[in-house]
Regions:
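Active-site groove signature of glycoside hydrolases
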Residues: 8-34
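Conserved alpha/beta catalytic core and glycan-binding cleft of carbohydrate-active enzymes
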Residues: 19, 32-35, 40-206, 211
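Short, acidic/polar
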Residues: 2-17, 187-193
Length: 214
């Protein structure tokens, strides 16, 4: 199809002419839909990517969900494409926030999420683990706010996710309280350590290492 050809030629241009060494597909599982939006197990685009020698060395990452409700983490139809593990994000946030019944989930995520991959630890490169991303709270915001505050963009706080598994540690927003500051810094280190030590590929949001807020 012409759309597949356009995507492949665009990737080759970015990779060969401009030196880009990897691509991320936002809502990428949508690319696996066929006629009448039916999910395919062997999508032509992913098959063509795998067979293209000029794209074989690129790093490929995808979101395993789309706007139509399709979610295929454990059976994403392209084994060489790493997939964002949203269960890792949610499980780690809940554990370090102190939610009940979150310890078992923490253990599963540390071991490579075998509960999501037929009882086996995920193959290296398949699970892209993350705590934060470009959407939503940064790491510093995650430990500083119980709710979103998207007021400056004129959307009246209607945009963005409402369910963030965040915890402000007693004070909403910036605080000069030394005890709150100490606890927030500790929690950021806990979350970062969990990300870096768990089995899988860690994805670190730029700026989280220095406490950036947005």
């Amino acid at each position: 199809p012409i759309s597949t050809q356009l995507i492949l030629e665009s990737m080759r241009c970015w990779a060969l002419e401009l030196g880009v060494d990897g691509f991320r597909f936002d809502l990428g599982i949508a690319l696996s839909r066929g006629n009448q939006l039916k999910p395919l197990n062997d999508p032509p685009l992913f098959t063509a990517m795998g067979a293209d020698p000029q794209l074989s060395d690129l790093k490929l990452v995808s979101e395993p969900w789309d706007c139509g409700g399709l979610y295929r983490l454990e059976d994403f139809p392209a084994k060489r494409i790493g997939t964002w593990n949203g269960h890792f994000r949610d499980g780690m946030r809940r554990f370090w926030k102190g939610d009940d019944h979150s310890t078992w989930t923490l253990a599963q995520r540390f071991k490579g999420s075998p509960d999501l991959y037929d009882g086996k630890p995920v193959a290296l490169g398949r699970s892209v683990n993350f705590i934060t991303a470009h959407d939503g709270f940064t790491l510093a915001d995650l430990v500083s706010y119980n709710r979103k505050h998207n007021l400056a963009n004129g959307e009246d706080n209607r945009d963005g996710e409402n369910h963030n598994n965040s915890w402000n540690h007693g004070i909403e927003g910036p605080s000069s309280n030394p005890l709150v500051q100490t606890l927030r810094r500790r929690q950021q280190r806990n979350l970062l350590s969990s990300l870096l030590l768990a089995r899988g590929v860690p994805m670190l949001l730029m700026g989280d290492e220095v406490g950036r807020s947005q």
